[in-house]
UniProtKB/Swiss-Prot annotation:
UniProt name for this protein: Protein brain tumor
UniProt keyword annotations, A-Z: Cytoplasm, Metal-binding, Repeat, Repressor, Translation regulation, Zinc, Zinc-finger
Outcome of gene disruption: In larval brain, results in deregulated cell cycle and defective differentiation of immature intermediate neuroblast progenitors ultimately leading to overgrowth and proliferation. RNAi-mediated knockdown in the larval brain results in overproliferation of type II neuroblast cells on the dorsal side of the larval brains but had no effect in the type I neuroblast lineage in the ventral nerve cord. Conditional RNAi-mediated knockdown in type II neuroblast stem cells results in the same phenotype.
Pfam families hit by this protein: NHL, zf-B_box
Binding residue positions for Zn(2+) 2: C328, H331, C351, H356
Composition skew (Low complexity), residue ranges: 159-175, 565-577
Record field: compositional bias (Basic residues): 579-598
Notes on the domains: The NHL repeats form six-bladed beta-propeller that mediate the interaction with the pumilio repeats of pum, and are essential for translational effector function.
The organism of origin for this protein: Drosophila melanogaster
Amino acid sequence: MASSPTPSLDSMRGGANSIESYEHAGYLSDSPLTLSGSSPPASDSAICSDEYTGGSSVKSRSEVTVINGHHPISASVSSSSSASSSSCSSSSSSSSSSSSSSSSTSGLSGCGSTSSSVISANNVASSNGPGVIGSNLQSSNNGGNSGISSLVVGAGKGSNSSSNSSSSNTSANGSPPRCTACKSKCSDAVAKCFECQSYLCANCVTAHEFMHCFNGHNVCLIKGFEASTTGTPLSVGSPSNNPASNEFKYASSLTMMLQQQQQLDSQQQQQQQQLLPAQPMSQLSKIVLAAAAQANSQEQQREDSIYGSLHPQQQQQQQQQQQRQLFCPRHKQELLKFSCRTCCILVCKECIVLEHSTGLHELENVQSPGMTTSTGSTANESALQTLLADMRGKIGEIVGIAGNSDQNLTKVKLQYQKAHNELNETHQFFASMLDERKTELLKELETLYTAKVNSNNSWQQRSRDLIDKGLATCEAVERSPAPPSSLLTEALLLRKSLEQQLQTGIQEMQLPFEIEFMSNYQSIQAGVRNTFGYIRANSSDGGPTGMSLTSNGHGKQPPIARPTQSASNSSASSAGSGHHGHHQQSHHHGHHNHHQTAHHQQLQAQSSLHGLGLGLSGASLLDSSSSAGGAVGAFSNGGLLLGGRDRNALAVEQHFGELMPKRGGGGYTGSNGSATSAVAHYNPYEKWSNGGSDNLFSSVTSGVSGSSAVADAFASLSAVGGSVVSGAGAGGSTVSSESLLDLTNKLLSATIYPPKSQIKRQKMIYHCKFGEFGVMEGQFTEPSGVAVNAQNDIIVADTNNHRIQIFDKEGRFKFQFGECGKRDSQLLYPNRVAVVRNSGDIIVTERSPTHQIQIYNQYGQFVRKFGATILQHPRGVTVDNKGRIIVVECKVMRVIIFDQNGNVLHKFGCSKHLEFPNGVVVNDKQEIFISDNRAHCVKVFNYEGQYLRQIGGEGITNYPIGVGINSNGEILIADNHNNFNLTIFTQDGQLISALESKVKHAQCFDVALMDDGSVVLASKDYRLYIYRYVQLAPVGM
């Protein structure tokens, strides 16, 4: 071992102060300060305090370093930027742990401690956990040097290494340092924490990495401590001592702030020490400082000569690497250290936890620049090269496409010229057709004018002849020599014929003969747009060909509004509706076994009652009555009025008591007054439905309190078939099927159905809505009627605006026709519309005062009008497959069937069965389905006026607003009781499915069905909604 260039203090004192081994069986203390053996002599302490009075240890917890078996000098030596001027203080040595790495900073640690670690603020590495793990630390202790030079070399190099890592906790025999952070005293240290001032084993490093209590701790991994403990000399010029490779890397911004604060404190302390008055320096201190300055100067020159050209490049690379560090845009404090191959983006730790789970996404670690290995670098370079190759390939494709731009322009130009020529040809054809039509109309006008002139001339000739004959007759009578009495008989004979001729002449003169050209400019505009043609372009860019123009050709936005969900959202909502239906089916499955027998009996009763026209309602009547106590069975038992009614009322009261807490949230006492008061103040929305009275639950309360609804039904039965109460026990009179049918209907409308539907309804949402209040295009003041033609165009009767508006299936305005008036092509309060499917003609009914029917063609041109002297209160209108017009009237409860010319084919009254009809539809079997708002059902008649059956009822179809029949022949009954509800039946009355809207609507006017499985709803909020209903499996009550 080479001798130290500076004499040892022990040799100067004349004796070796050996310290016994640091590692022994009895580990004395957890602190690295504890030593076994003799303490430093008093002379050493005197040396330290001779020059530096009041100086303390370099660190708060000093460490003892054993070098070559000698005890080091207990003094602190700090070298300034110049080798000649230096000051020594414990505070400056302590502050050197946070100063930046520079080759001019060195120092001797006092009281057995080497120079503290120099932490550079520029050397920042990524954090792998709560503890900040630094880069590998290599020992800077030169085994070949000893004494003062060996102490000074580590500090004089200006590197970030610390001799503490190899010598502070190392015994004289070269054993590695032990962990001082845990209770296990036999674990080798692999790192050091500068916050805890402890050496760490592998377990402690793991704890610092993952435990939150160690967040922000600076942990430095120790590399090569085995070599340093065995005494293997490390050359000063070796790459392992390179400051760039031995720096501590930190990624914590808080650590950098603390380091900067420590640097400022260190600089302030140094300035304060420089301002202190110079104290006399002992001879020994002068020798030590001179030796330290000389060694530092030699070491610095050696490093400058070896790494002078390399170090600036490494610093520049480090700065570039720090600039290349990217932070997550969402999590500002996290680095983008991972790459998600699945999503082809860089992510941080938080992004992995939230969105890029390991099981579903393929992740790889993007190594930090300071930690990149050769293998990782090669993989990243290959990935980068692959990406660049792909980009070059895409660029080549773009270049190829751009090269064909001339050909594309030529092709587009040819297509433009072709379209231009075809457009001109179409215009010429239209012009020729207009000229031809103009010639025809002029010829017709000339013919009519000539005929009128000729007729006038002939009449004038005849009138002159008549005048001449009349005057001649008068003169002949006056000149006659016979007495007047003899001529009186002849004059009386000629008087009658003469008066007739004069009257005929006067009437012919007063007959109006008007010639007028009738034209509909809006219809012409719509017809030209529909028939002239259109430009079709598949361009998707935002240029002129890609701009979407509205159908009215003016380029303005159509009056259409859609819900916030897009088309994808509407499809997702349909899937959500299916899921909801599955949940409902699973809910019903739990009750299937319980109701299986009852459902079977219901089907049998239904099949047996089809002959009476009861359908589902009759079956429900039998089923519900049997469950309520046998009200229908009481017909043969004689207890009809007392026992049957009391049991039925009791069942309804019990059901109502169960229903009210669910709907209103309040308790139900069971008394009549409490039930009535609970209904009176409950939910004012219940009064919104069409035809609804204030007594919303009048049927239920009447059943509870013994109202006259059921009694009236029984009284009618008594009037038809005799006294039921008195005659039932004694045999009574037999009730006819017709009277039983009437009684069944009245019972059905009185008490058999609950006030709120007990069937489970599937949710549906509207996918389009349009319209608003106003008088402009696409605006309404009262959209009271709606119909759909074969092209799925929506035809709306705007009553108070006295017009008909036509929209496409997306709700975009097309055209309108009509104006206020009583003349031809004028409308006055149109309230319902229907469409002839074959021809597209539009049938319009008007309410009072005209109460007539007008027919327009599909372009809005007037055809004819009729029915003003026949109709009184037209409410619903429809057209069958043979073009016959069926009109149902409210108030007078009458159905009238017209042909296209206005002739009455059939007419019948149905006041016995209808209460307030408001919608009508027909099937191909000449059956008329009429929705009755106040009877809560649909009544079915044939063309001869015979009542057939009933579909739906209270509790299922409350206050229906319209009825329709779809392409599958199913009957759809719409009502807006609470929500907008759709209930689908077969034509025989069997329930198929039930739906309801997610949003509530106020009063609704009318509904119409589209071919794509949608229903158009006209509401009193001046808007039209298009709902798509879903066909579901049959559901039970």
